[in-house]
Amino acid sequence: MAENQNNLIWIDLEMTGLDPERDRIIEIATLVTDANLNILAEGPVLAVHQSDEQLGLMDEWNVRTHTGSGLVERVKASPFNDHDAELQTIEFLKQWVPAGTSPICGNSVGQDRRFLFRYMPELEAYFHYRYLDVSTLKELARRWKPEILAGFKKQNTHQALDDIRESVAELAYYREHFIQK
């Protein structure tokens, strides 16, 4: 394990909904890659405890998805609150990436960052202000080279670590098939 300012921090959150004023984080996972997208380490995958009242505010899609994956039960049984999960994640990241050097990496990470800013501000501040958002490349490919889109299929498990691994693989796919070297 070696701290390196060129390493990239990948993150995914599962939430009870899309509004950080009302909804909450229920799972967080991170992993670190080198600049060439080789996975160096996977961080803790933590269900974040939320009250039954908070979970009761989820819409039908979230109830179905997070109950079906087993996440709701993991959230109810979790001993970790937002701050606990935040600190464990930061401790992992410190081993691999200096604070303030990695952009926040993943798919639609602007949404994740909104929740981090509200509920895990120390972790949000650990990232550089820039974004490495794979969904940007997907949108550009859809417009400029739509024939490549069928070549990458996501499993859409909506489990944080699975989703991050897919984001890394998706960026590698776009690097090979869309970005000219």
From Swiss-Prot:
Enzyme class name: hydrolase
Biological processes, Gene Ontology terms: DNA metabolic process
SUPFAM superfamilies: Ribonuclease H-like
Exonuclease domain ranges (all copies): 8-171
Domain of life of the source: Bacteria
UniProt GO cellular component terms: cytoplasm
Key words of the record: Cytoplasm, Exonuclease, Hydrolase, Nuclease
InterPro entries tied to this protein: Exonuclease_RNaseT/DNA_pol3, Oligoribonuclease, RNaseH-like_sf, RNaseH_sf
Active site: Y129
One GO MF term attached to the UniProt entry: nucleic acid binding
Family: Belongs to the oligoribonuclease family.
Protein task: 3'-to-5' exoribonuclease specific for small oligoribonucleotides.
HAMAP family, per the entry: Oligoribonuclease
Record-given protein name: Oligoribonuclease
Organism of origin: Yersinia enterocolitica serotype O:8 / biotype 1B (strain NCTC 13174 / 8081)
Name of the gene: orn
